[in-house]
Amino acid sequence: MDEIDKKITLLLQEDARMTITEMTEHLHLSRPSVTERLKRLQDTGIIEKYTARISLDAVGKSIQAFLRIENLKIPCKKFEEKIYEEYRILECYRVTGESSYYLKVAVHSMKELEELIDFVIPFGTVKTSMILSSPIPYRPIITD
C-alpha cells in the first residue's frame, strides 16, 4: 500500500458512502485511477466490506458490559458455536490469561443483562464489568 491507498482507506473508514467522485476531489486523482485502486484494495482483502455504524444508545441498547468467561467447561469450538447466534453479544475475543473469552454485550435493561449472564453461566465462570463510557468508541485503522 502506498500513501494514496492509505488515504483511500482512511476516507472510507470515515464515510463508507463516499462516492468515487468525492474521492477524486480529495485525492486529486482521476476517476479510473481511484476505481482501479479501490478494486485492488477489495481484491487483496484490505477492504473487506462496507458497513454502517449504528448508535447503541439510539436503538435503546445503552447498557453495555464485558463478560469475562473463565474456567470454560466445554471445548472452545463448542462454546463459540453456542454464543454465535446470541445477537446481544456484539464481539467475542479469545484471550490469554485467567479468562478464556471476553464478550462485549449490549442490552436494553439490567433484566436483559441478567438473562444473558444466565445464558452464559453454564459454560464457565462469568465475571461482569459494566462499561461506563468509551473515550475511543471507534478509531480508523492507520496502516503503516
Please place each PLM-identified region on the residue numbering.
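A compositional/biophysical signature of low hydrophobicity enriched in polar/charged and small residues
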Residues: 1-144
